[in-house]
Every structure is written in C-alpha cells, then in structure tokens.
Amino acid sequence: TGKTVTLQTIAEQFSANGVPVFLADVKGDLSGIAMAGSPEFKNADKLEARAKEIGLTDYAYRDNPAVFWDLYGEQGHPIRTTISEMGPLLLARLMDLNDTQEGVLNIAFRYADDNGLLLIDLEDLQSVLVACAEAAKELGVRYGNISKASVGTIQRQLLAFESQGAAKFFGEPAFEINDFLRCDEGGRGYLNILAAEKLMQSPKLYATFL
C-alpha cells in the first residue's frame, strides 16, 4: 500500500529541511533510505520516466544521513540508560507493582542514594534489594516497613524483565536525547533508525525505551 515509501519520503523531506527524525523500523525495510539509488537498480527507468511525467526536472539519486540504533547492539549503536536515570516510579509501572511493592522499591533507591551506591544496571538493583531485605528490621526504623515478600516479588519481576533483554538496556554510557537531535555538516537532519523488528517481541522493554 506504499506506507513504507510514504514514510521514507516524509522523513527525507524533514531531513532536507534540517529536521532530525526518529524512525522505529518494525519491518526491517527502512534502512534503504540511507543509500543512494542508481540507474542500474531495478525499475530505475520507471522512476525516471515518472519524474519527467510530473515535471520533476531536478530529479537525482541521493543518500540520506542516517544513524542506526539497536537496544541489543546487533544492528546499530547500542542504546543504554541507568537504573538511577529510569527512577523508581517508571520502573514500578513497568513491573506492575502495587503500592506496597512500589514503596519498597522507593526505599531501595533512597537507601542506595543515602549510602552512595550506584544503580547502573539490574544487578546493582538486585544487590541493593538483597541488602534491604537482610537489614529490613534496622532499615525499617528509618525508612519504613520493608516486607521481604515485597522484595521477593520485585526480584521476580526483575528476572522476568531481564528475560526480555532488559539487561542489555541498562548500563553505561547512558543515552542522551541530544544524540537524536543532530544535523550533518550540510545542515541535513540525521535520520535515527531504531531496529525494532526484534524489539517488538519484548513489549515491556520497548515501552521502557520509549
């Protein structure tokens, strides 16, 4: 139905006008936008004939500035963030925690902050949860009740989250949104293409990235 070509055309026009673009490549067919066409390509004669028919006199093959991204680091630059930057509120929503479990997660973050513990990846968070569970009685006086059952639930949710590939998303260096807002030397906006074909099979991880 031409949806891919329509999307590519819109993205090209934004790029040509100096506007960076983000594209999620769900079907794996957007990457061709980065490569210039050629008169030797299939159907090139039909394209050129159509260009003349509609009066497109400056028709020419041209590539586009593109950067490929992949949360798994397989088909593009890896995208990373830290547990600290994600924060307890968003993590709690992604793991479908109830109010009590979210409260324990908040305590874990506060405990890490008060003790200068870095929360970079899932292993860091698991370690802090273990520390909180082991010292639940002592920490409860300062932070509030820490239910070991809630800690166990959070740990199980983290394992399920990790099984979707989340471990590859959390780490350093952390992604900066400005990485998506760049132009090339000629003033054309970069087309940031996210490899989402595999990512779509892990909805929670996809939602985490967005």
Q: Where do the model's predicted regions map?
A:
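Conserved helicase ATPase motor motifs in RecA-like P-loop NTPase domains
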Residues: 1, 27
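Walker A/P-loop
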Residues: 4
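Phosphate-interacting basic helix/loop segments used at nucleotide- and nucleic-acid interfaces
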Residues: 7
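P-loop NTPase motor domains
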Residues: 11-21, 28-210
